[in-house]
Amino acid sequence: MTETRLRFPPSPTGYLHIGGARTALYNWLYAKQHGGKLVLRIEDTDTERSTEESIKGIVDGLDWLGIDFDEGPYFQTDFASDHKSAAQKLLDSGQAYKCFCSKESLDEKREAALAAKKSLGYDGTCRNLTAEQIAEKEAAGAPYVLRFRVPECESVSYEDKIAGTIRVARSEIDDFVIVRSNGAPLYLLCNVVDDIRDRISHVIRGQDHMTNTIKQILLYEALDAPIPVFAHMPLTLDNKRAKISKRSHGEIVAVQFYRDHGFLPWALNNFLAMLGWSAGDDKEFYTKEELLKAFSLERINKSSSIFNYRKGDPKFFTDPKAISMNEHYIRNMDITELGKLVQKELEADGLWDTAYADEKADWYLATIDMIRARFHTLKDFATLGRAYFGEDYVVEEKPLKKNVLKFEGLKEWLPLLGERYASLDDFSAEETERVARELADELELKPGVIINGMRTAVTGQLAGPSMFDIVTTLGQERMVKRLREAGRLFA
């Protein structure tokens, strides 16, 4: 029985794109499901654009996502001799030929075909040159490329695991170039040679590669190699139905962007998995084990998926579904594991207290458990939750106007409440609430004026956990200090 072997072959010309990450994820899922192997192959033949920084970024991004590989990374440039040997084999067997047509002559023919509204394909000028004609051109020093000699047939077809039967008429397939005039084999050939060497049994990739697939199938056959199973995923588009790309969308399509903006790795994996696939029901959230069980190529959508990024949207910095998924995992993950992740954020912002890992460990975990319900990313713990871990928290403009500045008397009422809190021996939620409501009664105010004003003064926020859970979490000393200083909000 043939071993199931897949590959993820990124080009190191930039960061790891979320489209590439989705491709890697689908390959990883399929390999794991079928007890197969997944190979990481860096296709670095574009020496002008390939960089070590990009290679590191891709590997780091995959590692952060938890997409592990059984082999690699292999580098395509390390196997240049294999690619040249394959090209020579095709030339020697007559399945490839030297084409001496200049770029200028090809451009002229193309323009003439356009004007005549005829096929733009290569016309086969050099397909049947005699040995004497070839020798004459070589003697004259004429440069040439190698073209694959497409065999005569009615059509070429294959069964795509997602798109179904794909059939292309022979008349639509030109004799295509496989080696440049400088002797460098093209991606089309290199990719096939590498897949043959790596014994790849399944190729899962984007639909933008489908134009190459028919040609590559011909190369597999010409090289007497088994043809892998192909599965071409529809592309991911933006909400204007344009292909998402590094050039058009910038860092928002980089995996690193989500890591740096406080996403959990599995939350992004879950989002990417659902970006073009479903199990056929309404289920959205999958553990790793559940997704490994449910995933199938046949359930990948045949139509393009939409990445709902709205540039400049002040509320959602990326697709709202991605944010919602991250929020779900933050709310529901093991609190100890969350604590470790939040620790890194607090350390980065200078908010970490070593006591949180020692005598205040219970307080620390209880606090992040209390506040996580309204947070979307790990970054929120050091920004929206800053008041729990430091004194340099920001009082947001909206709650400041709504809860504080609207009531001039709070300039005196909140410090007064602070004094009453200072005298309490029992600083429980029940007792602090009683005192706050008692003060409101004395001042003939609705309790919400005092309570909401206090919330904004001591946390900077409009909403959050129960106010008196906040009071006891912050503790008597900090509550008294912040209430006494509340008058500064009116400055």
Swiss-Prot record:
UniProt short sequence motif 'HIGH' region, positions renumbered to this chain: 10-20
Chief localization: cytoplasm
SUPFAM superfamilies, alphabetized: An anticodon-binding domain of class I aminoacyl-tRNA synthetases, Nucleotidylyl transferase
Gene3D superfamilies on file: 1.10.10.350, HUPs
Gene Ontology MF term list: ATP binding; glutamate-tRNA ligase activity; tRNA binding; zinc ion binding
Pfam families: Anticodon_2, tRNA-synt_1c
Location within or outside the cell: Cytoplasm
Annotated motif 'KMSKS' region, positions: 243-247
Keyword Cytoplasm tagged: yes
GO cellular component, one term: cytosol
Record-listed ATP binding positions: K246
Gene Ontology biological process terms in this record: glutamyl-tRNA aminoacylation
InterPro entries cross-referenced by the UniProt entry: aa-tRNA-synth_I_cd-bd, aa-tRNA-synth_I_codon-bd_sub2, aa-tRNA-synth_I_CS, aa_tRNA-synth_I_cd-bd_sf, Glu-tRNA-ligase_bac/mito, Glu/Gln-tRNA-synth, Glu/Gln-tRNA-synth_Ib_cat-dom, GluQ/Sye
Highest rank taxon of the organism: Bacteria
Sorted UniProt keywords: Aminoacyl-tRNA synthetase, ATP-binding, Cytoplasm, Ligase, Nucleotide-binding, Protein biosynthesis
PROSITE patterns hit by this protein: AA_TRNA_LIGASE_I
Enzyme class at the top of the EC tree: ligase
Recorded catalytic activity of this chain's protein: tRNA(Glu) + L-glutamate + ATP = L-glutamyl-tRNA(Glu) + AMP + diphosphate
EC number(s) per entry: 6.1.1.17
Chain's role: Catalyzes the attachment of glutamate to tRNA(Glu) in a two-step reaction: glutamate is first activated by ATP to form Glu-AMP and then transferred to the acceptor end of tRNA(Glu).
Family the entry assigns: Belongs to the class-I aminoacyl-tRNA synthetase family. Glutamate--tRNA ligase type 1 subfamily.
NCBIfam families: gltX_bact
Subunit structure: Monomer.
Name listed for the protein in its UniProt record: Glutamate--tRNA ligase
Protein's gene: gltX
